């Protein structure tokens, strides 16, 4: 080893950040850093964008809102060079540009955090953060692993994430993977940062950290385009709000000029209540009984009782073991101890669970929820293929009818049921997963983040649906990082921390404070 | 066919293989006057049977993201087992059943190694490829068994329907039909596609992915053993190296037929078209008296071509879709005028 380039330490990064040129600020007088004018995009028969305008100014957080399938992600993909617009033009600092590739957009310092993390699962965290730009040393240059990890650790710390830079990305949770992407975008010191639904899988604490980072970037003059479906977040964060509906531009104004109702009207075109109110019924006979469930090193001594007509919320921080419990209950993961019974019947495998009437809507829709390359109809029919088929032979007509029926009930926005879910917007993919499991007409339903990435209107729809299902006698276990959602829907709330159930609260006593206290370590709770 | 379905076919790998087949037929017809002849076609069918039979199992295996490199050796081992039994006066039916069982067991071993230990099927079947061949060698050494019962060796011609269609032809046609129905029209086939396209989704939906895979490996071994019977009756002799190198031909056929080596995609129809293509090319090489080494090179070239074609076709389809889009936009039919703000 001859010469060693000084690693880019946090101090050095600070210096480089100071080189961002002075900008007029947030008064709107300056030329937009990035502008889209009359941009359109058509996919096959779908008009995703229809002459949309958007202008991003330096030092502003600009929220882009709209229902699922409104065209938000498509617009961001055009802004970062993944798609080319069919009409219209893009301008950077007022000059027309043509991004043939994502690399061209990166040259203009535009960074993006995609809706679904796109990382290299087999590589370590640090490598993913610096993919293509790893710090080198020596001659011939080799990757300076130590500097890379140190720098990645610094970036992650800046995000408030306690992640091992040497960990394999495939072993991370969705939220953690998102933080890795965020660190990658940060490391590019972009002038424009596009974040497509970054908070959907994060807990309130993580959202707070993320917002702190985003505000810090804004104050240093970065233009930020933020996409999200949680209105309270939008109001907390955004300076300007642009709304799209069905691929069309609706309006763009200062956040202060909007209130919740006006924003929803702009997005949906009608008034929608923001939270569904639960119709509570007297719980019926016990259905699901979990006793002493444990998996070494993941969770232990978990007891669960679900009665017919009852909704039990499972709250906790990301990594508390909620998803792992659900997987073990359904029989996907090995259990080290404990039993699972549905109406007295012992369940061990997913097949037994499904036959007994248990359904599990998993959290990671792209990996576990839908096969994105296969038709919607085939996806919806898969769990009940035996029932839809005739003695083992497929009946495509019935599959399509089934998919259409549930697609309509959930207001799925798709060209037809033969379309591949890969072409659907994120929220609509989620609806396919829901359709698939509701079509099994389960007695007990486990929902893991069922409204992640779902728009306001559809979210209320899903809440109403959950309520209806419970009223009709279904038992529901609701895992959600959306605390208001858990509190509004649940009859009882269980809180998990580090693999243990730390609180079981009746809905009357379940307040945000008590839940958060049980979810975080006592030490922190005392300090707070 | 709707226009969208037509378009999907036009840009499919299968369509590309059909075009290649037509080109190959035209070229070989020009090169040799003996090619365009019913008897020659019957011969091509006979020569392609064993490859085709094994390819019927290899196609779903590739769809489910696995591969069986041991098929040639399994065929060899099965042929040797049959030769030993049949030449020692074991009743024909018993010998046939023992042969098929040998193939099934070989497949079961592959399947269990892959699923129980989570090993890559390339590694496992590369190992068993050597293992099965070694066993065949241990049983017969370098001798050639030719003392097979007449009733068996002549089955090819004796039970022929007319002069062109033989019993093995008919059996293969039935097997191909069954494979196509199972893969594309049955719930098992549907689960195979899910297991190959999104394994985690399949597991979460109650598909027993491992069981499917074991079943397909058993099918692969079984069909290799049946192919061994066909080959033995055709060649009227058995040696330890019977069927060696067959895996290359089978894989060429399956990949040329449009099955995606990354899983999730493949059709029996494509495999059959590719089988015909490889049959025609091999016939052309035989008529042209190409040396053996050159033939292997040609097959290898075809394999490479099929893999590159997959990528090129994908790119073409994307470009065509983009052009259609642009045309529609320029026409402005579905777009509203720019909103004024
Ligand atoms: N590659 C594609 N092929 C075909 N259609 C597509 C493709 N990408 C997007 N679409 C369609 O374009 C429309 C807009 O999708 P987009 O992903 O931009 O929505 P979105 O506003 O991001 O929604 P969400 O809030 O659910 O993420 C949808 O109707 C979608 O089905
Ligand atoms: Mg989106």
Question: Where do the protein language model's features map onto the residues?
Answer:
Chain B
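Structural signal for alpha-helical transmembrane segments and their membrane-water exit/capping regions
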Residues: 20-36, 64, 137-140, 181-187, ...
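Transmembrane alpha-helical segments in multi-pass inner-membrane proteins
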Residues: 218, 224, 234-300
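Hydrophobic alpha-helical segments embedded in the membrane of multi-pass proteins
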Residues: 48-57, 73-77, 108, 173-174, ...
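Cytosolic-side transmembrane-helix boundaries in multi-pass membrane proteins
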Residues: 1-26, 204-211, 285-341
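Single transmembrane alpha-helix segments in multi-pass membrane proteins
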Residues: 25-88, 112-119, 254, 258-268, ...
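Helix-loop-helix "hairpin" substructures at the membrane interface of multi-pass membrane proteins
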Residues: 91-99, 105-110, 114, 162-238
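Short loop segments and helix-boundary regions at transmembrane helix junctions
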Residues: 2-10, 67, 87, 104-147, ...
């Amino acid at each position: 080893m001859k010469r060693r380039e000084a690693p880019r330490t946090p101090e050095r990064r600070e210096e480089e950040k100071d080189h961002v040129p002075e900008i007029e600020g947030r008064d709107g007088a300056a030329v937009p850093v990035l502008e889209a004018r009359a941009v359109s995009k058509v996919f096959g028969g779908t008009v995703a964008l229809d002459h949309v305008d958007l202008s991003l100014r330096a030092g502003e957080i600009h929220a882009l809102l709209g229902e699922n399938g409104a065209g938000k992600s498509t617009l961001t993909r055009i802004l970062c060079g993944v798609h080319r617009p069919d009409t219209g033009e893009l301008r950077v600092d007022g000059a027309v540009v043509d991004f043939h590739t994502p690399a061209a957009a990166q040259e203009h310092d535009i960074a993006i955090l995609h809706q679904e993390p796109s990382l290299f699962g087999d590589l370590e965290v640090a490598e993913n953060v610096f993919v293509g730009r790893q710090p080198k040393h020596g001659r011939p240059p080799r990757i300076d692993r130590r500097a890379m990890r140190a720098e990645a650790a610094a970036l992650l710390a800046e995000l408030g994430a306690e992640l091992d830079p040497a960990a394999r990305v495939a072993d991370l949770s969705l939220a953690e993977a998102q933080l890795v992407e965020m660190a990658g975008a940060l490391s590019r010191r972009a002038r424009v940062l596009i974040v497509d639904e970054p908070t959907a899988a994060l807990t309130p604490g993580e959202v707070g950290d993320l917002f702190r980072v985003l505000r810090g970037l804004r104050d240093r003059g970065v233009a930020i385009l933020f996409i999200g479906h949680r209105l309270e977040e939008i109001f907390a964060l955004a300076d300007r709000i642009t709304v799209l509906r069905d691929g069309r531009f609706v309006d763009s104004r200062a956040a202060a000029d909007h209130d919740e109702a006006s924003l929803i009207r702009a997005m949906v075109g009608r008034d929608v209540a923001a939270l569904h109110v639960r119709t509570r019924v007297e719980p019926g006979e016990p259905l699901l009984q979990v006793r002493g469930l444990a998996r070494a090193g993941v969770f232990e001594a978990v007891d669960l009782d679900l009665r017919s007509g009852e909704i039990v919320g499972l709250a906790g921080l990301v990594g508390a073991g909620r998803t792992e419990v659900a997987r073990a209950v359904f029989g996907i993961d090995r259990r080290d101890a404990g039993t699972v019974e549905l109406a007295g019947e012992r369940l061990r495998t997913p097949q037994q669970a499904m036959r007994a009437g248990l359904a599990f809507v998993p959290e990671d829709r792209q990996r576990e929820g839908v096969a994105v390359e296969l038709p919607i109809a085939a996806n919806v029919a898969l769990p009940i293929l035996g029932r839809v088929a005739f003695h083992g032979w497929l009946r495509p007509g019935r599959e399509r009818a089934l998919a259409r029926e549930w697609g309509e009930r959930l207001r799925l926005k798709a060209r037809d049921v033969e379309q591949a879910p890969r072409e659907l917007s994120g929220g609509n993919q989620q609806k396919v997963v829901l359709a698939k499991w509701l079509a099994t007409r389960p007695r007990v339903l486990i929902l893991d983040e069922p409204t992640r990435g779902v728009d306001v209107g559809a979210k209320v729809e899903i809440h109403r649906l959950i309520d209806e299902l419970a009223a009709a006698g279904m038992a529901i276990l609701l895992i959600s990082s959306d605390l208001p959602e858990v509190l509004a829907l649940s009859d009882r709330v269980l809180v998990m921390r580090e693999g243990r159930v730390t609180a079981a609260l009746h809905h009357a006593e379940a307040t945000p404070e008590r839940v958060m206290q049980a979810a975080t370590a006592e030490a922190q709770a005392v300090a707070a | 066919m709707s226009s969208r379905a037509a378009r999907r076919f036009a840009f499919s790998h299968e369509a590309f293989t059909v075009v290649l087949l037509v080109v190959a037929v035209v070229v070989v017809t020009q090169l040799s006057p003996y090619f365009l002849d019913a008897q020659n076609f019957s011969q091509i069918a006979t020569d392609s049977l064993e490859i085709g039979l094994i390819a019927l199992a290899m196609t779903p295996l590739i769809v489910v993201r696995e591969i069986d490199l041991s098929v040639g050796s399994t065929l060899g081992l099965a042929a040797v087992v049959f030769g030993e039994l049949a030449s020692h006066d074991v009743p024909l039916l018993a010998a046939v059943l023992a042969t098929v069982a040998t193939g099934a067991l070989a497949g079961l071993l592959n399947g269990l190694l892959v699923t129980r230990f989570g090993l890559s099927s390339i590694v496992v079947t590369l190992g068993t490829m050597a293992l099965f061949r070694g066993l065949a060698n241990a049983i017969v050494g370098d001798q050639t068994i030719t003392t097979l019962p007449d009733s068996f060796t002549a089955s090819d011609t004796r039970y022929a329907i007319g002069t062109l269609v033989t019993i093995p032809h008919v059996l293969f046609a039935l097997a191909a039909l069954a494979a196509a129905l199972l893969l594309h029209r049955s719930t098992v086939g549907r689960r195979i596609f899910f297991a190959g396209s999104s394994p985690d989704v399949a597991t979460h939906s109650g598909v027993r992915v491992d069981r499917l895979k074991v079943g397909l490996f058993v099918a692969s071994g079984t069909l290799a053993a049946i192919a061994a019977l066909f080959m033995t009756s055709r060649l009227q002799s058995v040696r330890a190296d019977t069927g060696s190198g067959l895996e290359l031909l089978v894989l060429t056929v399956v990949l040329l037929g449009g099955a995606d080596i990354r899983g999730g995609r493949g059709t029996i129809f494509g495999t059959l078209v590719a089988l015909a293509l490889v049959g025609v090319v091999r016939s052309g090489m035989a008529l042209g008296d190409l040396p053996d080494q050159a033939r292997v090179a040609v097959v290898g070239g075809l394999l490479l071509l099929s893999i590159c074609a997959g990528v090129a076709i994908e790119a073409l389809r994307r470009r065509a879709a983009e052009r259609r889009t642009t045309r529609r936009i320029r026409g402005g039919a579905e777009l509203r005028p720019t909103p004024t703000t």
